[in-house]
Amino acid sequence: MSYTTRIPAKLLARQAEDGRMTRREFMKFCGIVAVAMGMGPGFAPAVAEALQAKGRPSVVYMHGAECTGCTEGLLRSIDPFIDILMMEVISLDYCETVMAAAGRAAHHALEDALRNPAGYVCTIEGAIPTRKGGVYGQVGGETMLSLFSRVASGAKAVIAMGTCASFGGIQAAAPNPSGAIGVREALAPFGIQPINIAGCPPNPVNYIGTVVHLLTKGMPELDSAGRPKMFYGTTVHDQCERRKHFNADEFAPGFESKEAREGWCLHKLGCRGPYTYNNCPTAQFNQVNWPVRAGAPCIGCSEPGFWDALAPFNKDVRQKSDKA
């Protein structure tokens, strides 16, 4: 099993040459998104048509209570590289992490983005502090609760990026002094129902695939937790390459063991794959690797209640289910 991730030399050479996406690279990206959406590679032309005909969708990317890990995951996308993604696939009109503006200039950039006549997709990364009126989380003197409700109310669609935004995540872990909660719960009084792209961090393909689905088919079908079924419709366990060892009752006794390196099941080392819905085994990260293949048990990071409900990690705290 591979424990390393290497960026293909040809990909680096192409990026160093001029940073532009060729037609072939663009269609490859569309194919990756189409497969992740469950449509198959044959849907790639439709994805390409949507992105080209409708123009690059404007994205207003807000940051709440978070570690910026979801943005970091997106920034480390290599197929395509993030600059190609921002300049040729979406129009990232506001994002505090990567924008040059700061202070009042950043505030003006946000207000300009909100006046876009073509509309915009609002993405919120991070939980929203609500205790004492939300004073524990502010941007430019305005509480995140107030600002995000205002930005989200005018959006064509709202996407909660990551588990903190989806369900509160580690920001809502006990004792949760700021009263942090997920976007859906925080903005429900304003009639806002976001699409939850859960994960810590989520796969960038799931985010881009959701944007493409909004362009091509409108609102995707969501599960009971507000996640797109096309990405979160199957458990990690049912897609895992180690599943055959689970069926054979072959469980790795330790992380350093020969059995773990040979691909035996990590369930007794705390793997939450049987209880976690995500497409990590098929989408992988940068189409190269994912935690369980690399030897780390799934910790259920895309599930409601993560962090508290699934701790302690790396311990077999549940019995093997007959349904697993």
From Swiss-Prot:
[4Fe-4S] cluster 1 binds at C67, C70, C164, C200. Its EC number is 1.12.2.1. [3Fe-4S] cluster binds at C280, C298, C301. Disulfide bonds: none annotated. Keywords: 3Fe-4S, 4Fe-4S, Iron, Iron-sulfur, Metal-binding, Oxidoreductase, Periplasm, Signal. NCBIfam families: hydA, TAT_signal_seq. This is Periplasmic [NiFe] hydrogenase small subunit 2. It comes from Nitratidesulfovibrio vulgaris (strain ATCC 29579 / DSM 644 / CCUG 34227 / NCIMB 8303 / VKM B-1760 / Hildenborough) (Desulfovibrio vulgaris). The lineage of its organism: Bacteria, Pseudomonadati, Thermodesulfobacteriota, Desulfovibrionia, Desulfovibrionales.
